[in-house]
Amino acid sequence: MQYPRPIAKLIEGFTRLPGIGPKTASRLAFHVLDMKEDDVLEFAKALVHAKRDLTYCSQCHNITDTDPCQICEDKHRDRTTICVVQESRDLIAMEKMREYTGLYHVLHGAISPMDGIGPEDIKIAELIKRLQDDESVKEVIVATNPTIEGEATAMYISRLIKPTGIKVTRLAHGLPVGGDLEYADEVTLSKAIEGRREL
């Protein structure tokens, strides 16, 4: 059976989201149709506002509604340490543990030659410029995901930063290899920060 065009378009829209296949998209579409109209309009408005009102911090490249973001603006944070993460959601995972008090740099991806993603496609050049412009940074913690791409990115960053004399460390591997940082619990992340090693 073919769906009416509006439902088909809605299902197609949901399948564009990561991890959403046709069955889940269909389930979500029919759930939306069962919702009260006010709730659907509120949901649609939230989507539009998030897309329209959010931007990226000009310093750390985290998603934010102010520029610079709250973390970069916070004068109480340790400005001698920058934690490099792949995505904004990884930064949020690090913040949840409430132990790391330094600054961040969001790469927006990882080096992945198989996917055609090179160093120039993520925010590595911006990180290097930031380190050149700010002499107070003494340590860069590379907190990329423990995947092949994350490891390759960590090694690439380490090779660029080492000659500057800035200490480069990597999170300890209490984190599962092949896993994503955002799914790690606070205790695991805390142990990983404590056990970080120099690259």
Curated annotation (Swiss-Prot):
Pfam families: RecR_C, RecR_HhH, RecR_ZnF, Toprim_4. Keywords: DNA damage, DNA recombination, DNA repair, Metal-binding, Zinc, Zinc-finger. This is Recombination protein RecR. One of its GO terms (biological process) is DNA recombination. A zinc finger (C4-type) spans 57-72. Residues 80-176 form the Toprim domain. It comes from the Bacteria. SMART domains: TOPRIM (SM00493). One of its GO terms (molecular function) is DNA binding. It comes from Shouchella clausii (strain KSM-K16).
